[in-house]
From Swiss-Prot:
GO molecular function, one term: pH-gated chloride channel activity
PANTHER family: PROTON-ACTIVATED CHLORIDE CHANNEL, TRANSMEMBRANE PROTEIN 206
Name the record gives this protein: Proton-activated chloride channel
Purpose: Chloride channel gated by pH that facilitates the entry of chloride ions into cells upon exposure to extracellular acidic pH.
Annotated family: Belongs to the proton-activated chloride channel family.
């Protein structure tokens, strides 16, 4: 009897151990439940098997797999487009850095800084220099004879910066300032007994007459001006009207360069003198500001690094999301495939 009791207690203990719960993965438990449901539906009466026949279930599985593959291909296409956008964005940014856009603006002024007018008369002699306003020049009283000189002028001599041998003599005249009142400077020169076939006087313009006066080395200042600015000419026997405009250009290193642009009009001088000498030439020139606007030019880099960073972040986010979705889709397809194989094996076992 005691042996029978020990054997019964041992059997009850084994049954209790088998009845204890085992830790199961939630996904595996869910798969097992689905498999059990599918198995139950497989061994159900013929009515249920008729309603959900194997060809219908197989077509549904194929359709799901087809759409999964299609979604993966779509997201791979989106990933390719995103990679192309990243490449194109970086390329455009580098191209904009190399090729800045020119920006032009206009600054309105009431008074200009008096420009410097450097004239190289040669053998010609200055007869008169006057300031007038409102584009009005009074009639000439006695052309060819010395007249009034109300301009601020200064003579200077320096060595030609190009030849380093020729001595050049320049007459520096303070230019007009009041653009609102249309201030102008009218100069008259006289040249007698010229042996040249053509006669003309050279001149150049620089931005500030005051800067010339304050310069410690005026000779070096004029040599630099002649090296930096272009020179022009006006001919004898005509009145040359020069209308100036100022252009300031900001360089890449932050420095600023100044350039004069001019429009000229030439009017023939009617010589009414009774006995003009042969070879006698009169030169007339007028300097005036064209308008009260200074043109400012600078290069602007249109590439915005913050917009590029934002675009790259959004593209990378799309890439990560697409990769995550593709990963989940592949996992789901593998799970469906395994479930289908298990179900098929169970059906074969059941049939056998």
């Amino acid at each position: 009897m005691e042996a029978i009791r020990k054997e019964l207690s041992r059997s009850y203990q084994e049954l209790n151990e088998e009845a204890e719960p085992v830790a199961i993965d939630p996904e595996e438990a869910e798969d097992e439940e689905k498999e059990q449901e599918e198995a139950a539906s497989a061994v159900a009466p013929d009515r249920d098997s008729d309603r959900s026949s194997p060809p219908v279930r197989f077509s549904r599985t194929c359709l799901k797999n087809f759409f999964s593959v299609l979604l993966i291909l779509v997201y791979l296409l989106l990933m390719g487009v995103a990679v192309f956008l990243v490449y194109q964005t970086i390329t455009d940014f580098r191209d904009k850095l190399k090729h800045p856009v020119m920006s032009v603006s206009y600054k309105e002024v009431n008074m200009y800084d008096a420009p410097g007018i450097a004239l190289y008369p040669g053998k010609a002699r200055l007869l008169s220099c006057e300031h007038h306003w409102y584009d009005h020049i009074p009639p000439l009283k006695d052309p060819g004879q010395p007249g009034e000189n109300t301009c601020v002028t200064q003579d200077i001599s320096y060595i030609d910066p190009y030849t380093n041998k020729t001595m050049k003599h320049a007459l520096i005249v303070q230019g007009p300032r009041d653009v609102r009142r249309r201030e102008l400077v009218f100069l008259q020169f006289h040249l007698n007994e010229t042996k040249q076939d053509f006669s003309a006087i050279d001149y150049l313009l620089f931005s500030s007459y005051e800067a010339f006066l304050k310069s410690h080395d005026q000779v070096k200042f004029m040599q630099d001006c002649e090296s930096s600015f272009s020179s022009w000419k006006f001919s004898g026997g005509f009145r040359t009207w020069v209308k100036m405009s100022l252009v300031k250009t900001k360089e890449e290193d932050g420095s600023q360069s100044v350039e004069f642009r001019q429009e000229t009009s030439v009017v023939n001088f009617i010589d009414r003198r009774e006995t003009p000498d042969k070879g006698d030439q009169l030169f007339f020139v007028v300097f005036e500001w064209k308008d009260p606007y200074i043109q400012e030019i600078q290069d602007i880099i249109t590439a915005n690094p913050w917009s590029m960073i934002a675009l790259l972040c959004s593209v990378f986010l799309v890439l990560f999301k697409a990769a995550d979705f593709a990963k989940l889709s592949v996992k789901w397809m593998i799970k469906v495939r395994r479930r289908h194989l298990k179900k098929r094996a169970r059906e074969l076992n059941h049939i056998s």
